[in-house]
Structures are given as structure tokens and as C-alpha cells.
Amino acid sequence: MNSIINRRVLIKSLLLSLFSSGFSLADSNNHKKFTIIFGSCSNQNNKMDHWQTIINYKPDLLILLGDNVYGDFNNESANQLKQAYKKLSENSNFQYIKNNIPIISIWDDHDYGINDGGRNWEYKNIAKKLFLDFFSVNSNDVRYKRDGIYNSDEILLFNKKIKIVSLDTRYF
């Protein structure tokens, strides 16, 4: 278990260090720019200035890598997680982002519901529904019907399809 956690931390850290807060891709033919911002570890109980910073970059896509809220809970009411999502949803900058910038999101342990949680977390399906509902995933989406929230999304970038695969390293 410890080596799995260390690998997750290492992979997440490498991704974040590679891309820092984001990066831009340019089309050499017509100098268009496409900006992607990566984010994670957004504790709703701290100052949330980072949402304004994201808006200032005017990204074309926001990829949230987990710990989008900190809502660890220990019973089926999941009140802590519900309150965490509620607090984030009340942030005007996050509201702007959610309404104006495409978001691809995956969870990590704190939006999964338990610190360092994995496949044996008894309330993982409660956390899953709250996550999908919060990020306005269409109710017909396959993630509502299958285990986990892993997914692949395609974006069109300079007339080329880019596939972004989000792995669920908690549910399984």
C-alpha cells in the first residue's frame, strides 16, 4: 500500500512540476494559442485566490487532478463532502470558471471521501455520485453506470484530436 501511495504522489508531483500552473500550445501555421491549466489540492477552507489566477490566464481548458475539495467523511450522510462542494460552488470565481471554461476532472483521496482511501472505501459510490453531480456530468454518461470515474475526453486542437485519459487511482 505504501509504495502505491508513493507512486501516486510521485506521478502527481511530476505532472505538476512539468506543467506548473499550465502551458500553451501554439499552431505554427497561424499563431493561434491554446492554453491548458492543471490544478489540484484546492482546500475550500483556505483562501481560494487561485481561481482568479486561473481566470486571468484565460485558459481554453482546465484539468483538475484531484483533491478538488477536502471533504473527508465517515458515514453515509457524507455531510462533510456535501458541504465542501457547496462551499466551492459558492465561490464566484469558481462559478465563472465552471460556466465559461471546459473542465476535465478526476478525484484523489480528499474528494473521494477519505485520506489515502482506496478500493475498500465503503462509501465510494456515494462520493462518486456527489463528484459526478457537482461537475455536471450528464446523467446518461457511462460513469454513472460503471465502477469508478475514469474517463477519456477528446478535444479538437488545431484540427487534430487530442485524447485526454483520466485514471481513477482510488476506486479500484
Regions found by a protein language model. Give the residues of each.
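N-terminal secretory signal peptides and thylakoid transit peptides that target proteins
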Residues: 2-18
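Active-site neighborhood of divalent metal-dependent phosphoester/pyrophosphate hydrolases
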Residues: 31-172
